[in-house]
Amino acid sequence: MNLVSRYAPSPSGPLHLGNLRTALFAWLQARWSHSIFILRIDDLDGPRTVHRMAEQAIEDLTWLGLDWDQGPVNNSSNNLGDLSIKGSCGPYFQSKCDDHYTKAFNKLKESGYLYKCVCS
């Protein structure tokens, strides 16, 4: 079995040192073990998502010398927003996964595996 490592920043603001540390550790693990490194954008929190922060995170990670095998990449060094996707295991933006989540939910529901949470 091959190891897959991923980093999933939230585009709610600029990357900070904690984000960069996590990205670096995930990247180092992937490169050390000769495995796949995936960049996935965790853009599910719509109200907190800041315009162009995903593109800026990609630019910042690239500037730091980190690369990834799958995920969104910036096609132009001077035009944030000119993104393409590399890899075939996407979608690499969480907001594009609704169909997958709906199918999984319906399968659990049909199988009788859903239950109410009784947490406080």
For the regions a language model picked out, list residue spans one by one.
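N-terminal Rossmann-like or analogous alpha/beta NTP/dinucleotide-binding catalytic cores
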Residues: 1-119
